[in-house]
Amino acid sequence: MEELRQTKNFTKRDYRLSENKLFYNHSKFGNSNEIDIPFENIEGEKVSHKISNNNTLFFSVLVYIVAIALFISKINNGGDDQSVSLFWAVIATIILAFYWFNRDDFWKIKLTDNNYLYIHKNIPNKEIPENFINSLISKRNEYLKENYLIIDENLDYQSQLSNFKWLKSIGAISKIEFEEKYLELKATVNPRKTDIGFGK
C-alpha cells in the first residue's frame, strides 16, 4: 500500500509514499498543511499513543455530581419532580459521550528532529494502517541501504562507518549486516588513511 487516508471529526490525514520520502497532508476545517518527510528523517520507532481531553472528562464528572446533589436535595425536601436533576444527568452523559468520541488512538513514529508522525490505529480499520506503516519502513530501509550502505574506497573511512552505525541504530540494517559491511569496509578502505596532508 502506497497511500493512506484517514478522516475523523472534520480532520483529514493523507499519507503518500514516494521513492525517497513520505508526503503528509493534514487538514481541518478547510485549513491544510502539507509537508514532505525525507526517509532519512524517519527513525522508525513506533509506539502506541492515546490522546484524550481529560478536562472534558473532569467536567462531565462534575456535572454528574451536580445532578446527584440536586436529586438528593429534592428527596430530602420531599419533592417528586426530578426534572432538573435529570436534565443535568443528560447533559453530563452527552459530555461524557463527547469525551469518548474524541479520544484518539495513534501509532506514534519518531522523526529525527524530535517530532512525531501520528497515524490512527483503527482508521479505516486496524489492518490498513499497520500495512501502510510496514510499507513505509520497508521502503525507507530499501532506500537507505541503496544510498548509505555502500563502500567506496575513494570516500572517507570514518564517514562510511558512521553511516553504517546510523543505519543499524534506526533498524534499517541488522547487526549481522552491519558486521559484514564493517569487515568489508576495513578490507577496502584504510582506516588510517588521511584526507589532508601527508601520511607517514
Indicate where each model-derived feature is located.
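Short, non-transmembrane cytosolic segments of multipass membrane proteins
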Residues: 1-34
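Alpha-helical transmembrane spans
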Residues: 52-103
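Transmembrane-cytosolic junction motif
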Residues: 96-117
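Charged, low-complexity cytosol-facing tails and large interhelical loops of integral membrane proteins
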Residues: 121-200
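Phosphoinositide-dependent membrane-docking surfaces
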Residues: 22-24, 34-50
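Short, surface-exposed beta-strand-loop junctions and turns on beta-sheet-rich folds
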Residues: 29-32, 115-116, 126
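Surface loops and adjacent helix of pleckstrin homology
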Residues: 27, 47-50, 98, 121
